[in-house]
A protein has these predicted regions:
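ATP-dependent small-molecule kinase phosphotransfer cores
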Residues: 1-66
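Short helix-terminating capping/connector loops at secondary-structure junctions
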Residues: 28-29, 75-78, 129-133
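Conserved nucleotide-binding/hydrolysis micro-motifs of P-loop NTPases
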Residues: 39-41, 87-91, 142-144
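A glycine- and Lys/Arg-enriched "phosphate-lid" helix/loop adjacent to the NTP-binding pocket
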Residues: 44-118
């Protein structure tokens, strides 16, 4: 995908939208469902970034957008809370390099900056798209121990899905 986003963008994002919808609608065996990403972040961040960067043709963007609109208007997709691990693009880039996954080696800092800006506009400034739930922001530039402390301070909110 990262090597040829123009070719694989529509294919991957169609599959992501389908799997995210399936994940949202699957029967829950626990009182809380935690998801790394959602059908909303797939559309508002990753599809939007592909389109804005010129790597997704307008017709592909229109088809994905129409499907997304139909899904969100006709199927209940409840979201109780969004936990935003807010981190700078530079920190994310450093962590990608440390993680050393082969498929992530070609991800440029500029890509992470674009993704970061879309998240900030959506979840912090609330200037781009509807936010379907309250947002809990946890600073994630710090080391893991500080992040764990932030999680523990907010554990009740996160696990109960209660309002922030």
């Amino acid at each position: 995908m990262y090597q040829d986003p123009t070719r694989w963008g529509i294919t991957l994002q169609t599959y992501v939208q389908l799997t995210m919808l399936d994940r949202h609608l699957s029967t829950m065996s626990a009182p809380v469902r935690m998801m790394e990403r959602s059908i909303y972040s797939a559309k508002y961040i990753f599809v939007e970034n592909l389109f804005r960067s010129g790597k997704m043709p307008e017709v592909d963007f229109a088809v994905l957008s129409e499907w997304f609109e139909w899904i969100t208007q006709n199927i209940a997709i409840p979201v109780d809370l969004i936990v935003y691990l807010q981190s700078s693009p530079q920190t994310c880039h450093e962590r990608l390099k440390e993680r050393c996954r082969e498929e992530e080696k070609i991800i440029p800092l500029e890509y992470l900056e674009a993704i970061h800006q879309l998240y900030e506009d959506w979840l912090i400034k609330k200037t781009s798209f509807n936010v379907p739930a309250p947002v809990l922001v946890i600073p994630a530039d710090d080391d893991l121990q500080k992040m764990l402390h932030q999680y523990e301070e907010n554990r009740e909110k996160i696990l109960a899905g209660s309002n922030v």
